[in-house]
């Protein structure tokens, strides 16, 4: 399901048998209709970014709900897929902040310790937030609580009102929070553009004696 260390830590914040409930939910959801991402990618964020290597969290709300977009990493799409509006704005801010990045797959961020997590890990095709409030929030809240317990600093990048509510789980003074409006077209001009989250994250990591992220990779 997830990287084994993630699995053990997350379980400690969940009711007994919650993983069984998740598997039952997934069985029913994927049997009853088209759901994104592909089932094998539901836990991809936790599989490609081990807990011990995580130093940044970028929290999304739920996966893209269009064909072939969602790949299990928040905001990321496969390279051959056109960038959705929020990702276009993320890359625009990155270009203004650090430099241009012309590819849409953010897997190279994940491999450097950037956990690209959505609060909901699945979505019905064409129905934004269609699985919100059903199963995922206790699980992904537990992921944030696990990160909060880390001894090494983590930079939490929280875009938009939904993500910013998760600050309640970030109580360890070792960690850092970067927050702004969401990169969606509705709110990007209300403070997302110009917020410089990428250079600010690297400045924090380097001040903490950690290696910065190569955001252009």
From Swiss-Prot:
Pfam families: UDG. The active site is at residue 62. It is an enzyme of class 3 (hydrolase). This is Uracil-DNA glycosylase. One of its GO terms (cellular component) is cytoplasm. Its main location: cytoplasm. It catalyses: Hydrolyzes single-stranded DNA or mismatched double-stranded DNA and polynucleotides, releasing free uracil. Excises uracil residues from the DNA which can arise as a result of misincorporation of dUMP residues by DNA polymerase or due to deamination of cytosine. Belongs to the uracil-DNA glycosylase (UDG) superfamily. UNG family. It comes from the Bacteria. Its EC number is 3.2.2.27. GO terms for molecular function: uracil DNA N-glycosylase activity. It is found in: Cytoplasm.
């Amino acid at each position: 399901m997830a990287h084994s260390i993630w699995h053990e830590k997350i379980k400690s914040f969940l009711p007994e048998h919650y993983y069984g409930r998740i598997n039952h939910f997934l069985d029913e959801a994927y049997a009853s209709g088209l759901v994104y991402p592909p089932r094998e990618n539901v836990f991809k964020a936790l599989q490609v970014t081990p807990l011990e290597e995580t130093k940044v969290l970028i929290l999304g709300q739920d996966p893209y709900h269009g064909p072939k977009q969602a790949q299990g990493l928040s905001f990321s799409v496969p390279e051959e897929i056109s960038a959705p509006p929020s990702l276009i704005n993320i890359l625009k801010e990155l270009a203004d902040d650090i430099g241009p990045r012309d590819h849409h797959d953010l897997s190279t961020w994940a491999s450097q310790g950037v956990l690209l997590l959505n609060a909901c890990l699945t979505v019905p095709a064409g129905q934004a937030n269609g699985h919100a409030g059903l199963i995922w929030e206790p699980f992904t809240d537990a992921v944030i609580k696990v990160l909060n317990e880390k001894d090494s600093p983590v930079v939490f990048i929280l875009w938009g009102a939904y993500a910013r509510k998760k600050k309640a789980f970030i109580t360890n003074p070792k960690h850092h929070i970067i927050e702004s409006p969401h990169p969606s077209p509705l709110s990007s001009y209300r403070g997302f553009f110009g917020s410089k989250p990428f250079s600010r994250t690297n400045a924090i990591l380097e001040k903490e004696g950690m290696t910065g992220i190569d955001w252009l990779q």
